């Protein structure tokens, strides 16, 4: 049984928060429900480290759920944000910075001809789906079980991330009407997608998929899966929406598409971006083919708007982050991710803990299962989440902050150095022993929570 360590300041803050905030947190996975104990309230971050309200410092392997690819408080980002704040926080008008950020995205991601800035990944996917329906004149959307595209009503069916962490098959408040035009299929099952297109192709507006699924744990697309979706969409006149909120500008300068689609010669019609492109501030985007984006207001009839879209502070952080993301940064992140994943897997193996490492570029996670492969949501759910909780708390006590859910991706930054890797290596064996002490049979989670 896991006995979480005391954290008096965080415990008091959590009690206060529970009185005024539902569940005590502003995004469900942060509540530690999946691992037990009290969430740590962080007060500062610097490089690869976080400091909590009790003054304890942790090596951060969450990186704000992806955005902090350069590490916390990166000097270039801090300087850019400070400079932007000093001249005003929001104008409600176009700004030079938003043009520069749009130009940078278009330059880095070849298929993106035009892009619209928004404030969150949820807004980006919601708007992309609306645009796809407006462009095609069709209503049906195909999504995949375990893939999370934000808390959009139509896309919460069999969603991953927080929905999975909390074990929710769906959520109250989402009506049947909202999901009536959503078809949910198993991830990586191209044959079934083809069968649905044969039956209902004339009604399908778009297929939306994570470029590499990372909200049920990390489950990469099988070879040919994304390209096959492109082929089927072409045959039946549907659009392909590639959700790169997590992978965009983190896997490479051109995201997952840059490592797969650019090489295999396929492109989606629309992309969604977030996380890294905001440098830790609320910023996201959707973009793609010029003829599709031309249907968006004010150029076209499909309406989308936002008071703080293109906010100059978030734009400044995003520009500074993307400009600092050189090939050297991506190489460092790839190396550190491989180092950490290898260390953890070795420790678990030495203690006889059944597990399956899984990665997509520098995103990685571990399924606590004896399965040889995990290719979809059902496989991701069939794992011993209690063992993960034991591993999590042992690492937390050793000053290593992991995702508080077995269904979330792990992240490193360019700031993670040899010392941080050595400390992780020193902590992993005890954590593996803690996981090994949790007995079988496997504790099957009913489902993953939503992006944090």
From Swiss-Prot:
<keyword id="KW-0663">Pyridoxal phosphate</keyword>
<dbReference type="InterPro" id="IPR049704">
    <property type="entry name" value="Aminotrans_3_PPA_site"/>
</dbReference>
<dbReference type="GO" id="GO:0006782">
    <property type="term" value="P:protoporphyrinogen IX biosynthetic process"/>
</dbReference>
<feature type="modified residue" description="N6-(pyridoxal phosphate)lysine">
    <location>
        <position position="275"/>
    </location>
</feature>
<comment type="similarity">
    <text>Belongs to the class-III pyridoxal-phosphate-dependent aminotransferase family. HemL subfamily.</text>
</comment>
<dbReference type="GO" id="GO:0005737">
    <property type="term" value="C:cytoplasm"/>
</dbReference>
<keyword id="KW-0413">Isomerase</keyword>
<dbReference type="Pfam" id="PF00202">
    <property type="entry name" value="Aminotran_3"/>
</dbReference>
<dbReference type="InterPro" id="IPR015422">
    <property type="entry name" value="PyrdxlP-dep_Trfase_small"/>
</dbReference>
<comment type="pathway">
    <text>Porphyrin-containing compound metabolism; protoporphyrin-IX biosynthesis; 5-aminolevulinate from L-glutamyl-tRNA(Glu): step 2/2.</text>
</comment>
<protein>
    <recommendedName>
        <fullName>Glutamate-1-semialdehyde 2,1-aminomutase</fullName>
        <ecNumber>5.4.3.8</ecNumber>
    </recommendedName>
</protein>
<dbReference type="InterPro" id="IPR005814">
    <property type="entry name" value="Aminotrans_3"/>
</dbReference>
<dbReference type="InterPro" id="IPR015424">
    <property type="entry name" value="PyrdxlP-dep_Trfase"/>
</dbReference>
<dbReference type="GO" id="GO:0008483">
    <property type="term" value="F:transaminase activity"/>
</dbReference>
<dbReference type="GO" id="GO:0042286">
    <property type="term" value="F:glutamate-1-semialdehyde 2,1-aminomutase activity"/>
</dbReference>
<keyword id="KW-0627">Porphyrin biosynthesis</keyword>
<keyword id="KW-0963">Cytoplasm</keyword>
<dbReference type="InterPro" id="IPR004639">
    <property type="entry name" value="4pyrrol_synth_GluAld_NH2Trfase"/>
</dbReference>
<dbReference type="InterPro" id="IPR015421">
    <property type="entry name" value="PyrdxlP-dep_Trfase_major"/>
</dbReference>
<dbReference type="GO" id="GO:0030170">
    <property type="term" value="F:pyridoxal phosphate binding"/>
</dbReference>
<comment type="subunit">
    <text>Homodimer.</text>
</comment>
């Amino acid at each position: 049984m896991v006995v979480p360590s005391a954290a008096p300041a965080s415990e008091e803050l959590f009690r206060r928060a529970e009185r005024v905030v539902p569940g005590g947190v502003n995004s469900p996975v942060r509540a530690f429900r999946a691992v037990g104990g009290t969430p740590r309230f962080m007060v500062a971050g610097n490089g690869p480290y976080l400091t909590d309200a009790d003054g304890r410092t942790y090596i951060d392997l969450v990186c704000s759920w992806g955005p902090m690819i350069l590490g916390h408080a990166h000097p270039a980002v801090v300087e850019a944000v400070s400079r932007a704040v000093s001249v005003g926080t929001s104008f409600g008008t176009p700004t030079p910075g938003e043009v520069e950020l749009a130009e940078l995205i278009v330059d880095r991601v070849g298929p993106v001809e035009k892009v619209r800035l928004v404030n969150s990944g949820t807004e980006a996917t919601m708007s992309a789906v609306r645009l796809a329906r407006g462009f095609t004149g069709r209503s049906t959307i195909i999504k995949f079980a375990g893939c999370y595209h934000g808390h959009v009503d139509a896309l919460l069916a069999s969603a991953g991330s927080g929905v999975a962490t909390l074990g929710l098959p769906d959520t109250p408040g989402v009506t049947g009407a909202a999901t009536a035009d959503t078809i949910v299929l198993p991830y990586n099952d191209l044959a079934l997608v083809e069968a649905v297109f044969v039956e209902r192709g004339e009604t399908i507006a778009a297929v939306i998929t994570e470029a590499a699924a990372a909200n049920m744990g990390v489950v990469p697309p099988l070879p040919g899966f994304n390209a096959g979706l492109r082929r089927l969409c072409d045959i039946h006149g549907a659009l392909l929406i590639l959700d790169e909120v997590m992978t965009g500008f983190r896997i490479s300068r051109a995201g997952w598409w840059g490592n797969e689609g650019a090489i295999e010669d396929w492109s989606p019609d629309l992309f969604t971006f977030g996380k890294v492109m905001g440098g830790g501030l609320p910023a996201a985007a959707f973009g793609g083919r010029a003829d599709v984006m031309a249907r968006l207001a004010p150029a076209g009839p499909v309406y989308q708007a936002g008071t703080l879209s293109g906010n100059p502070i978030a734009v400044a952080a995003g520009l500074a982050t993307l400009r600092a993301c050189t090939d050297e940064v991506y190489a460092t992140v790839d190396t550190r991710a491989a180092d950490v994943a290898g260390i953890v897997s070795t420790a678990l193996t030495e203690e006889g803990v059944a597990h399956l490492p899984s990665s997509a570029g520098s995103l990685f996670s571990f399924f606590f299962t004896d399965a040889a492969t995990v290719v979809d949501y059902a496989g991701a759910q069939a794992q011993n989440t209690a063992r993960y909780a034991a591993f999590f708390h042992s690492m937390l006590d050793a000053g290593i902050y992991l995702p508080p859910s077995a269904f979330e991706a792990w992240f490193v930054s360019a700031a993670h150095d040899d010392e941080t890797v050595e400390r992780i290596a020193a902590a992993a064996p005890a954590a593996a022993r803690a996981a090994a002490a949790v007995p079988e049979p496997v504790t099957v989670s009913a489902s993953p929570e939503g992006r944090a």
